Swiss-Prot record:
HAMAP family named among the record's database cross-references: UbiD
Matches recorded under PANTHER family: 3-OCTAPRENYL-4-HYDROXYBENZOATE CARBOXY-LYASE-RELATED, FERULIC ACID DECARBOXYLASE 1
Designated name of the protein: 3-octaprenyl-4-hydroxybenzoate carboxy-lyase
Top enzyme class: lyase
InterPro entries membership: UbiD, UbiD-like_C, UbiD-like_N, UbiD_bacteria, UbiD_Rift_dom
Originating species: Bordetella petrii (strain ATCC BAA-461 / DSM 12804 / CCUG 43448)
Pathway the protein contributes to: Cofactor biosynthesis; ubiquinone biosynthesis
Residue numbers annotated as active site: 314 (proton donor)
């Protein structure tokens, strides 16, 4: 599917029956979550709440939800016609991350053309007077309560900004980083920026604090960017390529960007809403001293304004514990005329992150095969909270091969740093079929011999099951057939009917009345 911006994408969804406009008044407080959750579980359409009720009154803009509620809509957002076509996207990313040696002159010319297209032809295009700056709120007009920010769950501490595309640049970086991080409003012009320590935005911020201590760190947050740009921020794009360039490759046209009004950051020109501002040093007059509740740990000494975030309902299906994160002070809000506010919720799978994980499986397979060619297929079950459990099938070649694959998966992509469980099966097992996977685990695996346990590894801080916040264990399960050296026993022979018998039964089947 080809499109220019979010509005164009929504128009095409509506023509395909994949967008439902809702004129009934619906509250941003809990009601939208319940409706979106029911529709997503039924694999229903994207939802545009045209009469959103926020803080007791009609909101000034509609709310878009469930945009990526099915794998097919994710594929359309990435410029593909079907989910299976995302394998081609993965092949492209694999080539950009680690190009193979050309097999001849024609192949070499093709690779040069592909790299030229990725690195030059799809470089972002800077435009003047971008649509995202048609309306500007500054000074006293900056009030986050004017945006219909959703309150997702009864135990949430506050509304939650969810689909914000956070734009940062480190002091030594040639390109900007784009990431999706949730944000908690704590004042009319302040949000808590909840990014995990290994994410690109957090890395850029730490580099800035080291290189320019005591100076504000510029940040922009785009809401309602085009789907290719949004999805580029959650895809393992190589460090040599910006998410804007990757979005251009997906879309088939260069990403148009405009310069933020208060910094040199480039923002999506067709985004619906953009928040501009800074992370402020703790001694800045605009910074607010942290409030430490009784019994809570003190904030880390970062030299910057910090606040205690949460609790919120998360993709695990539980409320997460509180933790300290930097505060984003919003200097201005820019937007298009008649903007659309893009929102989502996270909860017990399936939710939108889980659906994204299902679609991105197809992207991951070629990337993983480039490092581990023995991989046949790879699957992140949505009920595994997007990334916490992986099943991988391999062409086993030697004793201990499954264990090598486990450690390779934990290392090859940052996305799998927090994967707690990896199940390795042979290539006769479909990793996407739980009946087959469970059969392999229960027949080909000894719990003691074939289980790998690793202690004190990086883990998602939202994982309350880990003994220490941010550090926890990992388990690998070798559910492959065992080779000499792995067992001294005679291995089981699979049961199978003779082909001749099958053919005779096929011939008589129509006479059996079955």
């Amino acid at each position: 599917m080809k499109y220019r911006d979010l509005r164009d994408f929504l128009q095409q969804l509506e023509l395909r029956g994949e967008l439902k406009r809702i004129a009934t008044p619906v509250s941003t407080h809990l009601e939208m979550t319940e409706i979106a959750d029911r529709v997503l579980r039924a694999q229903g359409p994207a939802l545009l709440f045209e009469h959103a009720v926020h803080n007791g009154a009609r909101a000034a803009m509609p709310v878009l939800a469930n945009l990526f509620g099915t794998p097919r809509r994710v594929a359309w957002g990435m410029g593909a016609d079907e989910v299976s076509a995302l394998r081609d996207t993965g092949e492209l990313l694999a080539s950009l991350r680690e190009p193979e040696a050309p097999r001849g002159l024609r192949d070499a010319l093709g690779k040069v053309a592909m790299l030229k297209s990725a690195l030059w032809d799809m470089a972002p295009k800077r435009v003047r007077g971008p649509a995202c700056q048609e309306i500007v709120w500054e000074g006293a007009d900056v009030d986050l309560a004017r945006l219909p920010i959703q309150t997702c769950w009864p135990g949430d501490v506050a509304p939650l900004l969810t689909w914000g595309l956070v734009i940062t640049r480190g002091p030594n970086a040639r390109r900007q980083n784009l990431g999706i991080y949730r944000q908690q409003p704590i004042a009319p012009n302040k949000l808590i920026m909840r990014w995990l320590s290994h994410r690109g935005g957090a890395l850029d911020f730490r580099e800035h604090a080291r290189a320019h201590p005591g100076t504000p760190f510029p940040v922009a947050v785009a809401l309602g960017a085009d789907p290719a740009t949004i999805l580029g921020a959650v895809t393992p794009v190589p460090d040599s390529l910006s998410e804007y360039q990757f979005a251009g490759l997906l879309r088939g046209s260069r990403t148009e960007v405009g310069q933020a009004l208060g910094s040199d950051l480039s923002v999506p020109a067709w985004a619906e809403i953009v928040l501009e501002g800074h992370l402020l040093p703790a001694n800045d007059p605009r910074a607010v001293a942290p409030v430490v509740p009784e019994g809570a740990p003190p904030p880390p000494d970062t030299g910057y304004e910090m606040a205690l975030e949460g609790p919120y309902g998360d993709h695990t299906g539980y409320y997460n514990e509180q933790d300290w994160f930097p505060v984003f002070t919003v200097d201005r809000i820019t937007m298009r005329r008649d903007p659309v506010y893009h929102s989502t919720y996270t909860g017990k799978p399936p939710d939108e992150p889980a659906v994204l994980g299902v679609a991105l499986n197809e992207v991951f397979v070629p990337l993983l095969r480039r490092q581990l060619p023995e991989i046949v297929d790879f699957y992140l079950p949505p009920e595994g909270c997007s990334y916490r459990l992986a099943v991988v099938s391999i062409r086993k070649q030697y004793a201990g091969h499954a264990k090598r694959v486990m450690f390779g998966l934990w290392s090859v992509l940052r996305q799998f740093m927090y994967t707690k469980f990896i199940v390795v099966v042979d290539d006769d097992i479909d990793p996407r079929n739980w009946n087959e996977v469970v059969w392999a685990i229960t027949t080909r695996m000894d719990p003691v011999r074939d289980t790998v346990l690793v202690e004190r590894t990086p883990i998602d801080y939202l994982d309350f099951a880990s003994p220490v916040s941010g550090l926890g264990g990992k388990m690998g399960m070798d559910a492959t057939n065992k080779w000499p050296g792995e067992t001294d026993r005679e291995w089981g022979r699979p049961i199978a009917m003779d082909d001749a018998v099958k053919q005779r039964v096929d011939a008589m089947w129509g006479e059996l009345g079955l």
